[in-house]
A protein has these predicted regions:
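Active-site mouth of glycoside hydrolases
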Residues: 1-150, 182
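Active-site clefts of carbohydrate-active enzymes
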Residues: 100-108, 152, 157-185
Length: 185
């Protein structure tokens, strides 16, 4: 488990990256997320390893971590068929976020070890781009993030909520006028 799957999802991602490149848009790629693909609807089975592990267990289980090391290395070495360039060498991909909204219920040392293993896999794969880590969750281990070699941090923000249950209409710019860090005290 943990091998990069050549499928419609990857082809669509490659196509998106090519179109963004055509428009001069540079991006940070989030390598993985560890929850279902259907939120808020039912998940559809895709055969990915993240279905074998709970969102929090995926960051602690040795088999899951080994699968992620294989996957993240394969992802950065993947050659986009539309551009002919690997993700790690694409100048329009400016960096990688290890994962979206990680869950670290364990200790600071376990968290640090997980991040360092992902960083090691990226380095071994030849990545020279900055690597970011999402720090919006798991405040009990946040110091562990900064005891690693990540070059930056990322945050998620749902200024109008995550799911409304209906189509929202109107001007949403006032909702993104200011960001207040919820744990800044």
């Amino acid at each position: 488990i943990g091998n990069l799957k050549e499928n419609d999802h990857l082809r669509l991602l490659d196509y998106l990256f090519m179109r963004l490149r055509e428009r001069g848009i540079r991006i940070v790629v989030t390598a993985q997320t560890n929850f279902g693909n259907g939120y808020p609807e039912r998940n559809q089975p895709t055969g990915g390893y993240s279905y074998d592990y709970d969102k929090c267990d995926v960051h602690q289980n040795p088999k899951a971590i080994a699968a992620q090391e294989r996957y993240i290395a394969a992802l950065v070495n993947h050659v986009n068929p539309y551009t002919g360039v690997s993700y790690k060498d694409d100048p329009y991909i400016i960096g990688f976020e290890i994962n979206n909204e990680p869950c670290h219920p364990g200790t600071k040392e376990q968290t640090k070890s997980y991040i360092n293993r992902m960083l090691g896999a990226l380095k071994k794969a030849g990545n020279k781009k900055p690597v970011f880590y999402n720090v919006s969750h798991n405040q009990h281990v946040v110091e562990a993030y900064y005891d690693t070699a990540v070059q930056g941090t990322t945050y998620q923000w749902y200024p109008t909520g995550l799911v409304a249950g209906h189509t929202r209409k109107g001007n949403f710019l006032p909702h993104v006028d200011a960001y207040h860090i919820p744990f800044s005290n």
